[in-house]
Amino acid sequence: MQKVNTNDLAELTWSSPKGKFVGAGKQVSEALGRKPASTDLNERHPFDVEISRIPAGKLAFPYHSHSAQWEFYHVISGTGIVRHKDGSTPIEAGDAFIFKPDEPHQLENNGAEDLVFYVVADNPIGESCHYPDSNKWLVRSPERRLLRSENLDYFDGEE
């Protein structure tokens, strides 16, 4: 059995160049031995678990959908809004929800405290993401290549 205590995991933070998108995460699966770049399913694990945190007033990522990946969310603390294809839905501690492939989504912390939640993804090989607001695609590769009609920066057209 492999075991970690999530209280001991380092939190990785990220921010877009202009600060519209800010977040942090504890990579639980990687701490348990997951190797994200491997194509060996024993090394990749069949799912990926992260504890994510979005500061008050921020968005974690641009509005996007996955080509193959399912994502399950469980809110631990805080409040927010999930933007999705049918509009937006408020979320709070205890809420759980799921997005299947091709369902665009985005989480925003509209509360006064951090929005903290678990994300569990099924981790498919060959995944890509579509960003409807900026009409671009992310093709999963070591280079995190974005496609429109030319190479682009990840946050191009988002801020």
Residue ranges and their predicted role:
Residues 1-46, 133-159:
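A short, N-terminal "cap"/entry segment at the start of jelly-roll beta-barrel domains
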Residues 31-36, 50-66, 101:
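Conserved short histidine dyad/triad with adjacent acidic residue
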Residues 46-47, 51-55, 65-84, 120-124:
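Short, conserved beta-strand element in jelly-roll/cupin
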Residues 61, 87-89, 129:
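Short beta-strand segments
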Residues 81, 101-127:
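Ligand-binding loop in jelly-roll beta-barrel domains
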Residues 86-102:
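Short acidic-glycine-tyrosine-enriched beta hairpin
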Residues 125-130, 140:
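A short beta-to-alpha transition loop/helix N-cap that caps and shapes the active-site region
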